[in-house]
A protein has these predicted regions:
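Extreme N-terminal basic, low-complexity initiation segments
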Residues: 1-10
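Polybasic, low-complexity association/targeting segments
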Residues: 29-54
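Immediate flanking context of iron-sulfur cluster ligation sites
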Residues: 38-46, 69-91
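Local cysteine-cluster metal-coordination motifs and their immediate loop/turn environment
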Residues: 45-57, 85-101
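Glycine- and acidic-residue-enriched helix-capping/strand-helix junction motifs
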Residues: 56-65
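Ferredoxin-type iron-sulfur electron-transfer modules in oxidoreductases and energy-metabolism complexes
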Residues: 64-81, 113-114, 119, 123
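Short flanking/linker segments adjacent to small metal-binding domains or redox-active Cys/His motifs
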Residues: 94, 99-105, 125-157
């Protein structure tokens, strides 16, 4: 459609076959530059849409990660946060998982997220976007980010 972002179809991968009606509708945006049109640096909130969060496979039902993505996408997002669905964050035992990253910043992977956590996740992403290095002071981090952190990855470069 005019004005839509370029996208690529999910075809399965990383051992996760694209099955069920949810897989046909899921589209992953093509990579975008990390700088907004105003010159501010944006951060990316990656959401694993294939996370089943310990539930058995059900081809007719959207996985918990996909439900989380829908919940996040339905909310107003912070201006410097881009939400990108991904097929797998390799946190299957701790799904649904999200990851925060940005140029020159520490990156984080968080697990055990639910659709009900969406407002807090976006608040945490906004706090992350407001930092120069990706490190939100411990006491200022939202509780779910303090308690559900799976990994902290140093900046690349």
């Amino acid at each position: 459609k005019p004005g839509d972002l370029p996208a690529q179809e999910l075809t399965g991968g990383r051992g996760v076959p694209a099955r069920g009606s949810w897989a046909i509708r899921a589209r992953v945006p093509a990579p975008l530059p990390a700088i907004t049109d105003l010159g501010r640096m944006t951060v990316t909130l990656h959401v694993c849409i294939t996370c089943r969060a310990g539930e058995p496979a059900n081809d007719a039902m959207l996985p918990k990660g996909g439900q989380l993505h829908q919940s996040l996408d339905a909310l107003e997002r912070p201006p410097d946060v881009r939400i990108v669905p991904v097929e797998c964050l390799s946190a299957c035992n701790n799904g649904a998982a999200v990851a925060l990253s940005g140029p020159g910043r520490w990156s984080y992977v968080y697990g055990r997220m639910t659709p009900a956590d969406a407002p807090e996740i976006l608040a945490g992403a906004a706090a992350y976007a407001a930092t120069a290095d990706g490190i939100v002071p411990w006491r200022e981090r939202i509780a779910i980010f303090r308690k559900r952190s799976l990994a902290r990855i140093p900046p690349i470069g």
